[in-house]
Amino acid sequence: MRILFLHPNFPAQFRHLATLLARDSRHEVVFGTMNPKGSIPWVRKVLYQPSREVHPHTHHYLRNQESAVLQGQAVYRLAMQLKSEGFVPDVVYAHSGWGPGMFIKDVFPQAQLHCFFEWFYQAEGSDADFDPNDPLDADSKARIRVKNSPILMDLYSCDRGLCPTEWQKQQFPKEFHDKLTVLHDGIDPEFFYPKSNEKLIIPAIDLDLSHAEEIVTYATRGMEPYRGFPQFMEAVALIQQQRPNCHVVIAGEDRVAYGKNLPDGQTYKQLMLETLDLDRSRIHFTGSLPYLQYRQLLRASSAHIYLTRPFVLSWSMLEAMSTGCVVIGSDTAPVREVIQDGKNGLLVDFFDPAAIAERVNRVLDNPQHYQAMRKKARKTIVQNYDLEKLLPQHVNWLSQGLKLASKTKSPTRPKPLGFSSKLRSQLSA
């Protein structure tokens, strides 16, 4: 099989699948991306770059659409180059939303287009209107509706689509559900496994908590409201008041990965440190950690807090469960799909810092009582999210698409409508 992966980041969700396919000499794997860093053995990485930035005067509803078109054009030019070199894929697997697969059928009309569908934006009922203190105005609702334009184009054009969780699939229009399969990326329980009595010592950042008996952990890409960072910090203030020997370790970057920045340029970390009464000697910000140190953090955790709006479920929660953490998670739909309250984790009101602190205190007061919960958390991952079990299912999903195509294709099937030859050569920006 010849396969072309398309994702502006590298290797992102396609890391393990691309690695597995490339190990088999029967497959030729090419990865189109904007990220020049990193490599995967036997994967040919090819770079594309949009011809320009989004125009500053573009209507703000359409900026995401314009960005997707520019990225789609860049991939079109890359695909034409690959075609001229003799590479014609059987399957193109593109991450939807960014735009890389937008025009790929015009270059490779016979290729199967598979799309990874992570999220479909809704003004009501999921992330956007979740916070009652931050209501949406009419302008925001209209912008959210238009933001789905590139995703809708992919839903129409693709042969098959994949969503990592059932919750995420349910965000997409029901008329496209027949195209969508639920299959998670997978977590590696052979790497994320528990180790009793692990001490948290990270010399690179001068962190030594080998003396600490109570360590509360939190891991995130960005410190932001989407992942409950303000509520988490308010809970930390309460925990510190009640537990003078408890340390809190926060892995992640001081930025916003999802949602809005503060209007004055201040970060949420800065805001919470300024407004809350905290003992900073017992709060440790590690920044983004390499995987070995991140695993060490999870192994040393007495209680791990994971909060999210009704949005994309983070790998970090599943990695924490695989490592045997007691996870105190927000009682929101993506978390409830995995955690059963009181069995393999604990659920708590996203907006209630006092309840979060109370749940943490219970775990810290009686750690032995939660040993069975730690084991059930790991069992959940091993049974349902084990990378080694899921990867063959991903390969089978790709292959099934090819088998279905071979049964339905006709030698006289007309080519889909594409660009004129003039536009093919020019692709004006």
Predicted regions and their residues:
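Nucleotide-activated donor-binding/catalytic signature segment of Leloir-type glycosyltransferases, i.e.
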Residues: 252-256, 261-288, 292
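Aromatic "clamp/platform" in nucleotide-sugar-dependent glycosyltransferases that forms part
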Residues: 309
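Carbohydrate-associated surface elements
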Residues: 167, 186
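Short hydrophobic beta-strand element within catalytic cores of glycosyltransferases
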Residues: 326-329
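Conserved donor-binding/catalytic core segment of Leloir-type glycosyltransferases
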Residues: 203-227, 233-240, 249
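Conserved acidic donor-binding segment of nucleotide-sugar-dependent glycosyltransferases
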Residues: 341-342, 346-353, 362-367
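Acceptor-binding helix/loop patch of EC 2.4 sugar-transfer enzymes
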Residues: 52-62, 110-150, 190-195, 199, ...
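N-terminal subdomain of nucleotide-sugar transferases
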Residues: 1-46, 388, 419, 423-429
